[in-house]
C-alpha cells in the first residue's frame, strides 16, 4: 500500500482525490489547502484529511484541520502537486526534494528553463515506461494530453506519409468551478503558445506540428481544429474513424452540436463531476480533401488529465506493465462504458 498526498484541492486535486480514494493499492494521506474557503469543508465532508501550510495554520482555525502540508509530504510516498500553477518548482525545491518524496506536477508547470520541474513530460499514449524510476514527472496539460491521443495513433499508422500537423486550439476561458473568474465578452489570441513545444517534448522535437491558439468566452471544454497533410492522397474518413474505434479515451460523436451539449449529456448520465475524461472526435466535421485530413475534436479540460495522473502513479510507484496499469485505471474510471454511452447518445442518424 502506497501513501499519496494531493497537494491542492482545485479542479484537478478535488477530482483526483475522489477517484483514487477507491484504489485498494493507495492510501490517500489527505489534501492540501492554501486558502480558508468553502472547499475546505467540502474536502472534510468527503472524508479527506485537510493539511495547510504551517505559516497559514491560524487562518484555518474555523476548520477541523489535520495538520501541516509539510508533515503530510514527509509521511507520503508520492505527492501529486495540484497547487496553483507556477508554484511547482518552489514546492519541489522546498518540500519534495528535501523530504526525498516523489512528485507529479501538472500542466501549469514547465519542463523548460531554469525552473523546470522535470526532464519528462508524461503522456500515457507515448512514453508510459519512461516514467519508471523517475522521482519527478510533469503530467501534460489538458490540451497537450489531448493532442497525444490524436497525433500518436496517426503517426503510428501513417508515419512518414504525414508531412505536417496544423492545428488551431480554441481554449475555454475558465473551468466550471472557477466562479471567481469572469468570462469576458472577447476573444484573445496567444502568441508563442507553450502547447506545441510541450507536445514535441514527448513526441520528438522534429514532430511537424504547427499551432495557433485562441481563448474564447466559455467554460465548456476546449476545441481543436487539426489539419493533417499527407505526401499523397489523404486516407478516407472511414479509415480515420476506424483508427480511433478502439482507442482508449477517444469517443467518436456524430450528432453533437456543441461542447455544452456533451457536458450536459455527461451530467444526465451521472458521470462524476460532469466529466467525460476523454477526447471527442466530431465525425460530422471530418473531411478528407486532396492531401489533407481536416478533423475537429473537443477536449474535456477538467477531466482528461485525471486518469492520466492515475496511470502515471502506477508507473512511478509500481512500475506496472502498460496493459495492467490501464486495466487498473479502467476499474476506477470506467472509460470504456462512458465511451459507449456517449457514442450511443450521439450516434449517426440512420
What positions do the PLM features span?
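N-terminal Rossmann-like NAD(P) cofactor-binding subdomain of oxidoreductases
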Residues: 1-178, 325-328
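C-terminal substrate-binding/catalytic lobe of Rossmann-fold NAD(P)-dependent oxidoreductases
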Residues: 14-67, 161-171, 175-301
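Solvent-exposed amphipathic alpha-helical surface segments
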Residues: 23, 157, 251, 316-323
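Low-complexity, flexible helical/coil segments
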Residues: 115-123, 138-146, 175, 199-206, ...
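Active-site catalytic microenvironments for nucleophilic, acid-base chemistry
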Residues: 153-157, 229, 315
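NAD(P)-dependent Rossmann-like dehydrogenase/reductase catalytic/cofactor-binding core
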Residues: 274-350
Amino acid at each position: 500500500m502506497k501513501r499519496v498526498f494531493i497537494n491542492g484541492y482545485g479542479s484537478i486535486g478535488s477530482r483526483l482525490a475522489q477517484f483514487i480514494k477507491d484504489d485498494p493499492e493507495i492510501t490517500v494521506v489527505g489534501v492540501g489547502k492554501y486558502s480558508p474557503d468553502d472547499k475546505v469543508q467540502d474536502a472534510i465532508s468527503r472524508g479527506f484529511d485537510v493539511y495547510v501550510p504551517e505559516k497559514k495554520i491560524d487562518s484555518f482555525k474555523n476548520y477541523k484541520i489535520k495538520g501541516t502540508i509539510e508533515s503530510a509530504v514527509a509521511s507520503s510516498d508520492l505527492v501529486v502537486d495540484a497547487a496553483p500553477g507556477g508554484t511547482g518548482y518552489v514546492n519541489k525545491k522546498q518540500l519534495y526534494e528535501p523530504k526525498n518524496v516523489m512528485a507529479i506536477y501538472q500542466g501549469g508547470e514547465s519542463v523548460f528553463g531554469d525552473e523546470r520541474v522535470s526532464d519528462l513530460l508524461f503522456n500515457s499514449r507515448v512514453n508510459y515506461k519512461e516514467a519508471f524510476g523517475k522521482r519527478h514527472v510533469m503530467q501534460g496539460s489538458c490540451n497537450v494530453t489531448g493532442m497525444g491521443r490524436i497525433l500518436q495513433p496517426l503517426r503510428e499508422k501513417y508515419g512518414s506519409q504525414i508531412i505536417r500537423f496544423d492545428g488551431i486550439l480554441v481554449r475555454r476561458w475558465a473551468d466550471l468551478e472557477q466562479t471567481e473568474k469572469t468570462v469576458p465578452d472577447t476573444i484573445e489570441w496567444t502568441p508563442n503558445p507553450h502547447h506545441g513545444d510541450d507536445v514535441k517534448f514527448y513526441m520528438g522535437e522534429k514532430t511537424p506540428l504547427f499551432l495557433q491558439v485562441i481563448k474564447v468566452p466559455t467554460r465548456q471544454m476546449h476545441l481543436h481544429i487539426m489539419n493533417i497533410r499527407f505526401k499523397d492522397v489523404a486516407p478516407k474518413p472511414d479509415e480515420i474513424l476506424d483508427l480511433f474505434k478502439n482507442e482508449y479515451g477517444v469517443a467518436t460523436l456524430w450528432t453533437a452540436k456543441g461542447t455544452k451539449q456533451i457536458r450536459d449529456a455527461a451530467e444526465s448520465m451521472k458521470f462524476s463531476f460532469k466529466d467525460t475524461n476523454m477526447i471527442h472526435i466530431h465525425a460530422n466535421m471530418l473531411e478528407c480533401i486532396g492531401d489533407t485530413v481536416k478533423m475537429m475534436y473537443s477536449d474535456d479540460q477538467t477531466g482528461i488529465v485525471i486518469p492520466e495522473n492515475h496511470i502515471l502513479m502506477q508507473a512511478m510507484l509500481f512500475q506496472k506493465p502498460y496493459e495492467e496499469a490501464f486495466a487498473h485505471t479502467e476499474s476506477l474510471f470506467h472509460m470504456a462504458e462512458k465511451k459507449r454511452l456517449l457514442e450511443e447518445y450521439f450516434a449517426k442518424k440512420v
